[in-house]
Amino acid sequence: MQILLEDPAKAPQAEALASQLGQTDLPQFALVFTAARLELRKLDEPKLGAVYVDFVEGAVAHRRKFGGGRGQSIAKAVGLKAGAMPRVVDATAGLGRDAFVLASLGCKVTMIERSPVVAALLQDGLARAALDPEIGPWVRERMQLRHGPAVETLLGLTERPDVIYLDPMFPHKQKSALVKKEMRVFQSLVGPDLDADALLPAALAMADKRVVVKRPDYAGWLNEHKPSMAIETKSNRFDVYVMAALAG
C-alpha cells in the first residue's frame, strides 16, 4: 500500500503510519494525507472517490443534530434511557458512525477495528473530532479505539461492558451510492467477514446486560441464534440478546 503526501506538513504522520502498517500488501490502495484529513483511495477505481472518517461535518453531523436523539432505534436497542448510560463496546467499528451516534447520546464507547488501515482512518477522524470546540470535549471523554481481531480483543477485555454491539459486514442489496462505494472499498480492503458467526458467542460471554446485532432486514440471525427481541427499521434490524432473559 502506498502512503501519499498532498500536504508536506504531514510528513511526520506519514512516516509514523508507514512504520505502523509495515508491508501491507494492498497495491490497489493508497492512504493519502491531504491538508484536511487522511483518506483511503482505490487507485484502480478512482471514480469511487475517497473514503475517510468525518465526525464533525457531513452525514454523521446531520444525524447527530437531526437524527431523533434517544428515540432512534439504535438507542432503544442498546437500552439507552434516562438514568441509564450503558458502556458499549462496538466490536466491528468500521468508519465509526454507529459508535459516534451512541457517544453523542451519552454512552462511553470502545471501538474495536480489525483492519489496520480502517483503524488509521478512525484514529485520524477521532483526532480531528477531539479538536472541534463543539464535540471535542465529549469525543475525548467517551470514544476510544482499540485495533485488533474482534473475537480475541473481546475475550481479552478486562472489564465487562454493559452492551456489545456487532455490525458484521454483509452483502448489501441497497443501491445507494454511499453504501455501494464504501462496501466495494471495504470488501476489497478487508475481505469477507469470515469470523462473523464466531463474534456472537464471544460477545454473549463478555456482555453484562445485552448484545445488539445490526442486520440487513433480509439477513438471518447471526450464528442462527434467535434473539430475545428485534427492533426493525426501514432497511435494517437490531437483534437484541438480553442477558437476563437468556440466563433465565
Swiss-Prot record:
<keyword id="KW-0489">Methyltransferase</keyword>
<feature type="binding site">
    <location>
        <begin position="97"/>
        <end position="98"/>
    </location>
    <ligand>
        <name>S-adenosyl-L-methionine</name>
    </ligand>
</feature>
<feature type="binding site">
    <location>
        <begin position="113"/>
        <end position="114"/>
    </location>
    <ligand>
        <name>S-adenosyl-L-methionine</name>
    </ligand>
</feature>
<comment type="similarity">
    <text>Belongs to the methyltransferase superfamily. RsmJ family.</text>
</comment>
<dbReference type="Pfam" id="PF04445">
    <property type="entry name" value="SAM_MT"/>
</dbReference>
<keyword id="KW-0698">rRNA processing</keyword>
<dbReference type="GO" id="GO:0005737">
    <property type="term" value="C:cytoplasm"/>
</dbReference>
<comment type="function">
    <text>Specifically methylates the guanosine in position 1516 of 16S rRNA.</text>
</comment>
<keyword id="KW-0963">Cytoplasm</keyword>
<keyword id="KW-0949">S-adenosyl-L-methionine</keyword>
<dbReference type="GO" id="GO:0008990">
    <property type="term" value="F:rRNA (guanine-N2-)-methyltransferase activity"/>
</dbReference>
<protein>
    <recommendedName>
        <fullName>Ribosomal RNA small subunit methyltransferase J</fullName>
        <ecNumber>2.1.1.242</ecNumber>
    </recommendedName>
</protein>
<feature type="binding site">
    <location>
        <position position="167"/>
    </location>
    <ligand>
        <name>S-adenosyl-L-methionine</name>
    </ligand>
</feature>
<dbReference type="InterPro" id="IPR029063">
    <property type="entry name" value="SAM-dependent_MTases_sf"/>
</dbReference>
<keyword id="KW-0808">Transferase</keyword>
<dbReference type="InterPro" id="IPR007536">
    <property type="entry name" value="16SrRNA_methylTrfase_J"/>
</dbReference>
